Amino acid sequence: MEFEAEHEGLTASWVAPAPQGGKGAEGRAGVADEAGHGKTEAECAEDGEKCGDAEMSALDRVQRDHGDKHTESTSRKRIEAKYMDLLVEAERENKNLRKKYNIILDVSTKILVFGTCIMFATGTLIGKGTKIQVPVCNSTNLALAFLAGFLTRHV
C-alpha cells in the first residue's frame, strides 16, 4: 500500500512494509528483531518490558503491536505513525540547525566586540604616541559596537 501525507506545504510519500511473518506474536517478533533492537517480542516479554519502546519509531511500534493486519484503522495508525516520525525527524533537524546558527552568531558577536576593543586600544595608543587620531576608534563607536553586539545576540 502506498501512502502520502502533506503538512504545511511539504509532501511525503512512502510504501507500507509487507507483512512480517505469521499472525500474532510470530509476526511481531520478526518486526521487533528486524528493527535492530536485538530482542524479539518474546524475549522482551520474558524480561517484562516492551521491546525497545524508547528507541523505536512510531511506525515500528504500530507494526509491532498490529503485525500484518490490514484493516482501515491499522492503515490509519500506520499513516499517523509515519507522520509523527516525520515530525520528530524535522524537529531533530531544526534543533541541529539552531545549534549551528547559535554557534556562528556567538562567534561573530565575540569577534565584533573583541575586534572593536582592539581597534579602540590601538587607536588610543597611536593617538597618544604620534598625535594621529583614528576616527573609527573613539568611545562613541565603541559604545555603538557593544550595543550592536548585544542586539545581534539577544534579538
Curated annotation (Swiss-Prot):
Cystine crosslinks: none
Region (Disordered): 1-50
Keywords: Coiled coil
Positions with biased composition (Basic and acidic residues): 34-50
Keyword hit for DNA-binding: no
Pfam family, one: Herpes_pp38
Listed InterPro entries: Herpes_pp38 (IPR006930)
Keyword hit for RNA-binding: no
Coiled-coil residue windows: 76-107
Protein name from the UniProt record: Phosphoprotein pp24
Name of the encoding gene: MDV008
